[in-house]
């Protein structure tokens, strides 16, 4: 179920503060965040966030197409190695 429209998008307050500070400083450095649940807002376009995936911060460059999505969608937490190959099928 999606979030109610009247509530508006959820963003952790520290993410907003860090983004605002980065805009004011003018530097284009990676902003480290741990809030995968926060929504990407239009004011984040052009910034680079380091989204934590449980092991390291994955750099994510924010574009206009990402507005309304969550930060966690761009930082996968699981690594897929593929299914184990069938040894009997390889021998033939």
UniProtKB/Swiss-Prot annotation:
Record-linked SUPFAM superfamilies: Ribosomal protein S19
Gene Ontology molecular-function annotations: rRNA binding; structural constituent of ribosome
Keywords for this protein: Ribonucleoprotein, Ribosomal protein, RNA-binding, rRNA-binding
BP term (GO), one: translation
Pfam families: Ribosomal_S19
GO cellular component: cytoplasm; small ribosomal subunit
Purpose: Protein S19 forms a complex with S13 that binds strongly to the 16S ribosomal RNA.
Name this protein carries in UniProt: Small ribosomal subunit protein uS19
Highest classification ranks of the organism: Bacteria, Pseudomonadati, Pseudomonadota, Alphaproteobacteria, Rhodobacterales
